[in-house]
Amino acid sequence: MLWCKFLRSPFAHAKIINVDTSQAEALEGVHLVLTGTDVEGIRHGRGTYKDEPVLCWDKVLYVGDRVAAVLADDEDIAEKALSLIDVQYEELLPVLSAKEAAEPGAIILHPDFDQYLGVKNPPESANPFKSLGNPCLADDLDWNVFPQ
C-alpha cells in the first residue's frame, strides 16, 4: 500500500512561479511526485461541472488549493517529502468576499468565466436578492460562502 499526500497552497491567490521536487523525489520510500505541470488541464469536481484542477499548474485560488502530490511507502515519508518540495509563489491580491468581487474594477479570478458551463443561462432562482422579496434587505446582508 502507498500513501498519498497533497502539498497545499498557503495563499488565497498566487501565481505558481516554480515547483522544485528534486529533493522529495530523491527521498527513499518516495515512488512518485506529481505537480500541476504533470496533469495540466485535467480537472475534477463533485457536481455536474468538472472545473477544479486536480493539481494547480499556473495559479492557486484559495488557501488549501492542491499544488503537488506525493506517493510514498508510509505516511511519515510522504509528509517528509512534502516538506522537501520548494514552491516559489508570486502572491496576488485575494478576493475575500462576494461584495468585494462585485465592486467595479475587482480582481478577476476566472478570466474565462464567460465560457464556464455553470453560468450559461443560469436560472432566475440563482439571484438570492430576488428571492428575498425585499430588495432593501440586500444592502444589510453578509454572505458567507465556504471553500470548495
Where are these regions (language model features)?
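Flexible, low-hydrophobicity surface segments
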Residues: 1-140, 146-148
